[in-house]
């Protein structure tokens, strides 16, 4: 089984791509063989696109089975057509969506300084409960963790009170880990849904083991 991959010849796959149960958004120009690995491993449809003209799709978008949120400047209508689910632009200055929203199909943890209006848009688009918070004191929660409908993996320096909040919000046990040989902002190097995962190519065997345990892939 293939467990690691690069996108644009970099292991920072969570910066360049994002996925849900049904869709993997990858930047235009991703190698066909990479697309094939992503599609096969995650059992989800590949959509090649740009977000606001940029290739860092993972940093600028976040979705679940109900919808996707995108940064300012994205054509929401076009994205809705491409993905087949709701598409909205996150309002306000803080809108590198993938960096600041951590979400699955039941809940979302978001940057603590997001406006009430932004919270409303997230809740209505993703159809989830939304809570402001941090992970390891970091406000960019979207890259400080990875959550699926089966598991939750976060930054190693997460605090006890943050763990309590995360477990209550997502109703999943919290596990800690890293990707790409010690990267604590592990979301930058991991794509996962409830069916499978792929990590960046620098991710070590022990790191892969933690990912598999946290996200429920151990037999």
UniProtKB/Swiss-Prot annotation:
Gene behind this protein: eif6
Q: Which UniProt keywords apply?
A: Initiation factor, Protein biosynthesis
Q: What's the source species for this entry?
A: Methanosarcina barkeri (strain Fusaro / DSM 804)
- Role: Binds to the 50S ribosomal subunit and prevents its association with the 30S ribosomal subunit to form the 70S initiation complex.
NCBIfam families, alphabetically?
A: eIF-6, PRK04046.2-1
Q: Which HAMAP family match?
A: eIF_6 (MF_00032)
| GO BP terms in the entry | cytosolic ribosome assembly
- Protein biosynthesis is among the record's keywords: yes
Q: Which CDD domains match?
A: IF6 (cd00527)
Q: What is this protein called?
A: Translation initiation factor 6
- Keyword Protein biosynthesis: yes or no? yes
Q: What molecular functions are annotated in GO for this chain?
A: ribosome binding; translation initiation factor activity
Family, according to the entry, reads as follows: Belongs to the eIF-6 family.
């Amino acid at each position: 089984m293939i467990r690691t991959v690069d996108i644009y010849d970099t292991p920072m796959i969570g910066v360049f791509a994002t996925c849900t149960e049904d869709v993997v958004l990858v930047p235009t120009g991703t190698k066909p063989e990479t697309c094939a690995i992503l599609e096969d491993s995650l059992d989800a449809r590949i959509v090649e696109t740009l977000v606001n003209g940029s290739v860092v799709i993972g940093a600028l978008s976040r979705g679940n089975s109900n919808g996707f949120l995108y940064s300012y400047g994205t054509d929401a209508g076009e994205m809705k057509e491409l993905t087949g689910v709701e598409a909205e632009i996150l309002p306000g200055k803080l809108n590198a969506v993938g960096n600041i929203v951590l979400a699955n199909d039941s809940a979302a943890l978001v940057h603590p300084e997001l406006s009430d209006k932004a919270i409303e848009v997230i809740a209505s688009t993703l159809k989830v409960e939304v809570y402001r918070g941090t992970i390891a004191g970091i406000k960019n929660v979207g890259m400080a963790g990875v959550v699926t409908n089966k598991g939750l993996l976060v930054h190693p320096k997460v605090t006890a009170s943050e763990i309590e909040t995360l477990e209550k919000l997502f109703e999943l046990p919290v596990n800690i880990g890293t990707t790409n040989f010690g990267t604590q902002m592990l979301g930058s190097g991991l794509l996962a849904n409830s069916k499978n995962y792929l990590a960046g190519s620098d991710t070590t065997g022990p790191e892969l083991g933690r990912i598999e345990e946290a996200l429920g892939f151990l037999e």
